Swiss-Prot record:
Record gene name: ERF10
Record-stated family: Belongs to the AP2/ERF transcription factor family. ERF subfamily.
Main location: nucleus
Highest rank taxon of the organism: Eukaryota
GO cellular component terms, A-Z: nucleus
Stated name of the protein: Ethylene-responsive transcription factor 10
Keyword DNA-binding: yes
Cellular compartment(s): Nucleus
Annotated domain remarks: Contains a slightly degenerated ERF-associated amphiphilic repression (EAR) motif, which may be involved in the activity of transcriptional repression.
């Protein structure tokens, strides 16, 4: 009888212990779920505050990578890795202006945020998939700061004045001169066109000395054969057709 009571008591104790352990386990699961939910809410809040830029990806270790697609070669061009998303976005905007000119879609407005010098060079530290054809693009510093690109002083002065040199006016009609002067007023368009032409046609024509001369300096080679033809003048008879026979 005593043994049976002990077994019942042990069974009840085991049952109570199992329920208690299960209750403790359930509390632990709920606590972990609450912590996970709180972290998720916190991460969501941070993500909602972060601004996303075109052409910029955030690395898991915190840096920002920028890249752009070459519209001609249809390949991705690596622009570099930056400390902040804004620096990476500026690098993308500079590359977009290089590739598409004033029609580029940028992260920041072209007017007001970017001046004439906004057409900053593109880093030629390209991905291995890009051919060497893009190697002639100007550089961007390793720290992400764009190097200044020189602009033709004559072109800048002409664009600021909005006028053409006098010798050009002499050769053009008033209507054509006015239209050309209006073209030079839009300096970003001129720079974009020049850069596009330089990128598409990088080769330039240069004069080559072929060693040919015309005139008294032309050298005449004598024949090497000894059988030279001896040409003698033929004496024509002095005939007077008007004389009487």
């Amino acid at each position: 009888m005593t043994t049976e009571k002990e077994n019942v008591t042990t069974a009840v104790a085991v049952k109570d212990g199992g329920e208690k352990s299960k209750e403790v386990s359930d509390k632990g699961v709920k606590k972990r779920k609450n912590v996970t939910k709180a972290l998720a809410v916190n991460d969501g809040g941070e993500k909602s505050k972060e601004v996303r830029y075109r052409g910029v990806r955030r690395r898991p270790w915190g840096r920002y990578a920028a890249e752009i697609r070459d519209p001609v070669k249809k390949k991705r061009v690596w622009l570099g890795s930056f400390n902040t998303g804004e620096e990476a976005a500026r690098a993308y905007d500079s590359a977009a202006i290089r590739f598409r000119g004033s029609k580029a879609t940028t992260n920041f407005p072209l007017i007001g945020y970017y001046g004439i010098s906004s057409a900053t060079p593109v880093n030629n530290n390209l991905s291995e998939t890009v051919s060497d054809g893009n190697a002639n693009l100007p550089l961007v510093g390793d720290d992400g700061n764009a190097l200044a690109s020189p602009v033709n002083n004559t072109l800048s002065e002409t664009a600021r004045d909005g006028t053409l040199p006098s010798d050009c006016h002499d050769m053009l009609s008033p209507g054509v001169a006015e239209a050309v002067a209006g073209f030079f007023l839009d300096l970003p368009e001129v720079i974009a066109l020049k850069e596009e032409l330089d990128r598409v046609c990088p080769d330039q024509f240069e004069s080559i000395d072929m060693g040919l001369t015309i005139g008294p300096q032309t050298a005449v080679e004598e024949p090497e054969t000894s059988s030279a033809v001896d040409c003698k003048l033929r004496m024509e008879p002095d005939l007077d057709l008007n004389a009487s026979p």
